[in-house]
UniProtKB/Swiss-Prot annotation:
It comes from Vibrio atlanticus (strain LGP32). It holds the Pfam family SecA_PP_bind. ATP binds at Q87, G105, E106, G107, K108, T109, D513. Residues 852-863 have a biased composition (Low complexity). This is Protein translocase subunit SecA.
């Protein structure tokens, strides 16, 4: 109550921000008469002037009013379009590194030109990031004339560009591209072997379009560059044949019959688990099919791989549905469908063998599993930018997440014209059939009135179901879903025509406005070199149709189901009522809808259904509140998953930074001999400690063992026993110094033979190759650790703390092994000539390019990995060993008596 009273008196935080920004808008507007009087050349010269003023010490904020006024004036001259005051406010919010919530049709693309121009002045590069290649190319081409008029260069960063093209694109002042490409380029750059092969420069300022889609919906999707692991396609096929025999154990089963089911499924958390009875049944089937020995168990260490395949196959059959979660193309390829946008995502694959299991289920060719070579989440990638901002039509519901994870404040920008859309209350039916009948009747009424309708569905399956119902009713319509998005632009262009009916699978993220009366630009594009008269006629005809649609009530939105997220529902509604146009919206629900079925209590469902007749609808405030409560619950759960995923990935991210910084240092240095020398001292000192314990008596020294170790591992043939026999005053410290000194002399002799420059190049190559190999193994080890870490909770330990502790130990081990391996290789390998180094370099370069070509974003499916409230990250196929893993501090199995990490130990 007090908070509401205070807000009334002093305004909300958003109101206060807008008041402050409106004062700056007045400053910008004051420049308008002066700038209108400038010639084109004088206006263009402003860019050079601003850059000179920056060099003299002025800040971007000081330049902002003039810079924004310059862009507005240039836009008037190039496009005949003047930025509204609210767009100026949006531009300032973006420049401040915040999120601007701007309604659909308010001109986000034009708004982004303001901060993009201002932040391009320091010549550090501005990245405008969007969700797909089409939008990146479209926005770049749309805004290119404006930026080039002002003397700025524009680039595009999309998939399948050659490295030289990418490198050139990154030199542009303003670069448009997709989130995937920017992330992959970062990973590829950190797999390069030469500094000149890297394409990116510093990450200075980014404007993320559809920021909620990229920073929230995609936050659980790590970007992974992977290489193929061993082929196990036959195993997937054989195990796939066993799964249909399994039966689900219903939660309603009585205790007496509960043991009869083979697996349990939780629809809320999207998890599936074998029961004890199911485990025994699967083991019997495995034995019959020759996959396991009699008396063996799925959970023995040697069968972990089989268990992995069984779990993947079970999830593929039970949790993932064709035409909802994925489609199968005519070429026999399983393609993921994005649950948020309804788009297909070619090239993306689920990890953990799930994609292969789905391929086996559908009877198509099984692709090889993958091993992670490099990985980063979008959350951690975008936090690398010095300044990050974003735009979307729906951000306010996720404002807390933007603030807590990215430190981004959300500012709701007012519309240029008041919103007049009529949002009608939800209507709820008992069955899905009743609901669809009501939707058909509503559509018929709208078509008769000449009002266009946009019908939003949650899956391809539902869109096709509705399409068939409309065909039976002989209602002409278009379907816009993942299967037909090639025709998307044409369908969207005509979706605002009188009486048009468009079915769309999750319109979120489409990036194209539905214009009432259709798109006159689309008609214009069909003409070759249209005359001025033709253009005027098309515009005049369009105005008549536009006014007719407005009179009919504008675009009518029909929601066929509530989404888990209120934001997606708001995005669907937001397609109507753009720029003050008339419009309406209504959601039709049934008690059979997923959200209501899973999250509405049995008592509530019973109360509603008991009083409903067939075909009867209810509008209930209590039910609406219950639905919103369910949505909030799901949103909160998804936020917790993303937050936990980030907490886990932060551990890997800290290690990633160390490794990538080391790579940068190696690649930018021509001479790393000092680093090698320090490593040699550390490694040899550690080896000597094993055989001559510090401050120990001479009787306790193992001189013979030390001599053998130095000879075998470092090619150092020293007669240490002879030194001691000759000099009885050769004490421990002096002996250490002599060994280290002789090792340095031996290496210098090698340098004299092959030449200093050849050896410097070889040192760099060995260090990079060894680091990359160990980092790849380390990523696999981290994945394995992550998969089982939630089990620590049963031992009364905090899984997150255990993960941090053990991953730190793994990383320390990586650094130790890196030093040892590099020193060992450099000591033992005999380089004859520069050609050998170049050959090694070329081989590694080819491997890196091959790996980069395989780059793919793998879905983390984090909601399926939440075990004991601990979200687990996406991981590639687990590499399983036949024997028990040897601890790094345990005795080495080779029988040397040394610790494993000091003998044959490497990061597993």
């Amino acid at each position: 109550m007090i908070t509401k009273l205070l807000t009334k008196v002093i305004g909300s935080r958003n109101d206060r921000t807008l008041r402050r920004l409106r004062k700056i808008v007045k400053e910008i507007n004051n420049f308008e008469p002066t700038f209108e009087a400038l010639s084109d050349d004088e206006l263009k010269a402003k860019t050079v002037e601003f850059r000179e003023r920056l060099d003299k010490g002025e800040s971007l904020d000081q330049l902002l009013p003039e810079a924004f006024a310059t862009v507005r004036e240039a836009s008037k001259r190039v496009y005949g379009m003047r930025h509204f005051d609210v767009q100026m406010i949006g531009g300032m919010v973006l420049n401040a590194g915040q999120i601007a919530e701007m309604r659909t049709g308010e001109g986000k693309t034009l708004t982004a030109t303001l901060p993009a121009y201002l932040n391009a002045l320091p010549s550090k590069g501005v990245h405008v990031i969007t969700v797909n290649d089409y939008l990146a190319k479209r926005d770049a081409e749309t805004n290119r004339p404006l930026f080039e008029f002002l003397g700025m260069t524009v680039g595009v960063n999309v998939a399948n560009m050659a490295p030289p093209e990418k490198k050139e694109a990154y030199q542009a002042d303003i670069l448009y591209g997709t989130n995937n490409e920017f992330g992959f380029d970062y990973l590829r750059d950190n797999m390069a072997f030469r500094a000149e092969d890297r394409v990116q420069r510093e990450r200075f300022f980014a404007v993320v379009d559809e920021v909620d889609s990229i920073l929230i919906d995609e936050a659980r999707t790590p970007l992974i560059i992977s290489g193929p692991a061993e082929d196990s396609s036959d195993l997937y096929t054989r195990i796939n044949t066993l799964i249909p025999s399994l039966e689900r154990q219903d939660k309603e089963d009585s205790e007496e019959y509960r043991g009869e089911g083979h697996y349990t499924m939780d629809e809320k958390s999207k998890q599936v688990h074998l029961t004890e009875n199911g485990q025994e049944f699967v083991e019997e089937l495995m034995v019959k099919n020759g996959l396991m020995e009699e008396g063996d168990t799925l959970y023995s260490p040697t069968n972990i791989s089989l268990l992995h395949h069984v779990n993947a196959a079970l999830r593929a059959h039970v949790l993932f549905e064709k035409n909802v979660d994925y489609i199968v193309t005519e070429e026999g390829e399983v393609v993921i469908v994005d649950e948020h946008t309804g788009r297909t995502m070619p090239g993306r694959r689920w990890s953990e063998g799930l994609h292969q299991a789905v391929e086996a289920k559908e009877g198509v060719k099984i692709q090889n599993e993958n091993q992670t070579l490099a990985s980063i989440t979008f959350q951690n990638f975008f936090r690398l930018y010095e300044k990050l901002s974003g735009m979307t039509g729906t951000a306010d519901t996720e404002a807390f997440e933007f603030q807590s994870i990215y430190g981004l404040e959300t500012v709701v920008i007012p519309t240029n014209k008041p919103m007049v859309r009529n949002d009608m209350p939800d209507v709820v039916y008992r069955t899905e059939e009743d609901k669809f009948n009501a939707i058909i009747e509503d559509i018929k009424d709208r078509v008769a009135a000449g009002q266009p309708s946009l019908v939003g569905t949650v899956s391809i399956e539902k869109s096709e179901l509705l399409s068939n119902a409309l065909k039976k009713s002989k209602i002409k319509h278009n379907v816009l879903n993942a299967k037909f998005h090639e025709m998307e632009a044409e369908i969207v262009a005509q979706a605002g025509m009188p009486g048009a009916v468009t079915i769309a699978t999750n319109m979120a993220g489409r990036g194209t406005d539905i214009v009432l009366g259709g798109s006159w630009q689309a008609q214009l594009e069909k003409l070759d070199n249209p005359t001025k008269e033709q253009i005027e006629k098309i515009k005049a005809d369009w105005r008549i149709i536009h006014d007719k649609v407005l009179e009919s009530g504008g675009l009518h939105i029909i929601g066929t189901e509530r989404h888990e997220s209120r934001r997606i529902d708001n995005q669907l509604r937001g397609r109507s009522g753009r720029q003050g146009d008339a419009g309406s919206s209504r959601f039709y629900l049934s008690m059979e809808d997923s959200l209501l079925r899973i999250f509405t209590s049995d008592r509530m469902a019973g109360l509603i259904q008991s009083g409903m007749d067939e075909g009867e609808a209810i509008e209930s405030k209590m039910l609406s509140r219950s639905i919103e409560k369910a949505q909030r619950k799901v949103e909160g759960r998804n936020f917790d998953i993303r937050k936990q995923l980030l907490e886990y990935d932060d551990v890997a991210n800290d290690q990633r930074k160390v490794v990538y910084e080391l790579r940068d240092e190696l690649m930018s240095s021509d001479d790393i001999s000092e680093m090698i020398e320090h490593n040699r001292e550390d490694v040899l000192a550690s080896v000597i400690d094993e055989y001559i314990a510090p401050q120990s008596l001479e009787d306790m020294w193992d001189i013979a063992g030390l001599q053998d170790r130095l000879k075998n591992d470092f090619d150092l043939d020293f007669d240490i026993q002879g030194w001691l026999d000759e000099d009885d005053k050769l004490y421990e410290e002096a002996l250490r110094e002599r060994i280290l000194g002789m090792a340095v002399d031996s290496y210098k002799q090698k340098e004299e033979v092959v030449g200093a420059q050849v050896l410097r190049n070889f040192e760099k190559s060995v260090m990079l190759q060894t680091l990359d190999g160990l980092w790849k193994e380390h990523l696999a080890a981290m994945d394995h650790l992550r998969q089982g870490i939630h089990l620590r909770g049963y031992a009364q330990k905090n899984p997150k703390q255990e993960y941090k502790r053990e991953s730190f130990e793994l990383f320390e081990g990586l650094l130790d092994v890196l030093k040892t391996d590099v020193v060992t290789i450099l000591s033992k390998v005999r380089v004859q000539q520069q050609e050998e180094v170049e050959k090694m370099e070329a081989q590694r370069q080819a491997q890196a390019e091959q790996a980069a070509r395989r780059a793919q974003a793998q879905h983390a499916t984090a909601e399926n990995q939440l075990a004991d409230d601990e979200a687990e990250a996406a991981s590639p196929q687990t590499v399983v060993r036949d024997e028990r893993k040897v601890g790094r501090n345990e005795p080495c199995p080779c029988g040397s008596g040394k610790k494993y990490k000091q003998c044959h130990g490497k990061i597993d």
